[in-house]
Amino acid sequence: MLSAKHIELVKSTIPLLESAGTDITEYFYQRMFKHNPELKHIFNMSNQRSGGQPAALFSAIAAYAKNIENLAALSGAVERIAHKHTSLNIQPEHYPIVGHHLLATLRELAPEAFTTEVEEAWAAAYGLLAGIFINREDELYQKNANQLGGWLGARQFKVIEKRQESSLVTSFVFAPIDGESVVDYQAGQYLGIKVEPANHEYREMRQYSLSDKPNGKTYRISVKREDSRTPGNEPGTVSNYLHDQVNIGDVLDVFPPAGDFHYVERNEPVVLISAGVGVTPMQSMLEMLASKALDKPVFYLHACENLAQHSFNERVQALTNELKLTHHTWYRDLDGNEQEALNSQGQSNSGSVNSHMGFMNLVPLKAELPLDKGDFYLCGPVAFMSFVKQQLIELGVEDTRIHYEVFGPHSDL
């Protein structure tokens, strides 16, 4: 435990942290990668260039300083980060490296404020937090290793199927080359993969949501080709590599499933809300629900640009007949042929299919949705999820029943 003096000194640096902002974490990453370039093989360098990861790390550091006396308030963040770390195969020996560069960053950027006493306090605080992460990650590693089909670290998998789901999304099905079983996962979790693109200076590690129900034999991920997130930004390194270079028969390193966002079994209605490639964890949940033939209402709400970009559309149409499923889709831009195709979609036997134009508006569905008792799962762009969450709150949904996943560095809604 930290001493009262250490806590006081750490809290005294909060104004310094807030005034410096992401300058601290940007400097930290530059320093660390300069002195320990081998870590570029672990960190997502695209998130470094976009500024997403420095911003996320700054938020985490500031939150830790503010809650240094109430670490229970950080339990959700610790769980989320620990899962991400296991998908990257982070080991205890990595923590002293990060701690060294964090302390050096604070010392070099604020030499007058970051006295020897303050540095000792932050060293103790970092050591405490590192211990929390190391212990939790060890629990997750051992849990994966001890389950049927489980393993530690990287395991080689072969691509046995590659299928286009839409104009932007392609699915990849992996089977282990050792022919043994694979550990089950919870619907909504993701898979860590490592690739080595030709003529690329470092390996790349990514996490992609699993998009099918567990079967003990294979894994499926569905990846959106990131041509360019916004004008002026670079195309996605790994997504384009997977789409263009990885084919059936190729072998990749895969890490066990992880992630704190997943379906939780309850006897309440389920509402799955997604936009774009955020549909992938929802598809996993939907497939799992269908396999269990649960007798409860399921709502599937999805937003995308047009029919060409609507991943899993035909599969969801089929599942509508198997579940008590109500299916709503919002499109932004349909051509004449797509509009005609939508018009031909009728009522299913056990659920309903509905299409809308424009942004997702839940107000007209107020009487239809289980606002008082349903479990709501969200995934998609942060702006979309913030927009939807605000609607749900205004419609009376309790915040504790809204669960969401952010692709990339975490952001609060």
Describe each PLM feature range.
Residues 1-154:
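Globin-like tetrapyrrole-binding proteins
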Residues 72, 298-413:
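Reductase modules of NAD(P)H-dependent flavoproteins
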Residues 147-250, 304-306, 317, 330-334:
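Ferredoxin-reductase
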Residues 188, 278, 381:
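Short, conserved phosphate/pyrophosphate- and ester-handling motifs at nucleotide-, phospho-/glycolipid
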Residues 243, 255-267:
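A short, basic/flexible loop-to-alpha-helix module at the beginning of a structural domain
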Residues 269-288:
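A phosphate-binding catalytic loop at a beta-strand-loop-alpha-helix junction
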Residues 288-297:
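Conserved S-adenosyl-L-methionine
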